[in-house]
């Protein structure tokens, strides 16, 4: 049976699995309110689905159309937007924002105040450190051409992204790659490599004892 704090809001139709906890002031199943100028789709979204044993922490928001697997932790004041698919055993840290149409693989950890932009893919066992910023729009809001080209980064299995790094639109971080703190990633990162700097460049291989 799910536990919902009296101050939490769970919108009609939301599916809560066995042992789910929705803590103080959290909101689950919220339909988005769009700006008149928004290019996002406007049809009603299906209910949010929250898997067994998942915790939606104090002040967190999970929008309608989101699907969270089992044993997920959504930290205090974090936000998971519509059409996000989160696999089992994922941690979304305090104040992190996962934008719409994003996929997050099992056991991935997104730490406090990270920003995962819309149309991103994070595979299994990814680590995203605090205050990482991902982007998806090379045109920065100008021209209609941007709508067809809008794409967040793809972060492959076991890759790690250091604190404060910035990932530019559409780039791919390869399997088991390591992006150093504060790096600005403007092009694809090869699998198993360490990149640092602005713009990011390959420094060396990831040590074997750090590989999954």
Give the role of each language-model region:
Residues 2-196, 201-202:
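Structural signal for interior beta-strand "rungs" in well-ordered beta-sheet cores
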């Amino acid at each position: 049976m799910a536990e919902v704090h009296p101050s939490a809001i769970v919108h009609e139709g939301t599916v809560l699995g066995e042992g789910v906890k929705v803590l103080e002031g959290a909101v689950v199943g919220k339909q988005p309110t769009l700006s008149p100028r928004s290019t996002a789709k406007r049809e009603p979204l299906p209910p949010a689905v929250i898997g067994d044993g998942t915790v939606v922490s104090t002040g967190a928001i999970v929008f309608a159309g989101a699907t969270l697997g089992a044993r997920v932790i959504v930290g205090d004041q974090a936000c998971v937007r519509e059409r996000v698919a989160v696999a089992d055993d994922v941690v979304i840290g305090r104040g992190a924002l996962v934008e719409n149409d994003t996929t997050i693989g099992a056991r991935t950890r997104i730490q406090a105040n990270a920003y995962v932009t819309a149309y991103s893919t994070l595979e299994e066992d990814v680590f995203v450190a605090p205050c990482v910023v991902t982007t998806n729009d090379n045109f920065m809001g100008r021209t209609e051409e941007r709508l067809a080209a809008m794409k967040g980064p793809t972060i492959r299995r076991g890759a790690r992204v250091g604190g404060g790094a910035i990932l530019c639109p559409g780039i791919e971080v390869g399997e088991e790659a390591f992006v150093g703190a504060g790096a600005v990633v403007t092009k694809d990162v090869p699998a198993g490599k360490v990149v640092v700097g602005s713009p990011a460049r390959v420094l060396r291989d990831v040590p074997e004892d750090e590989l999954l």
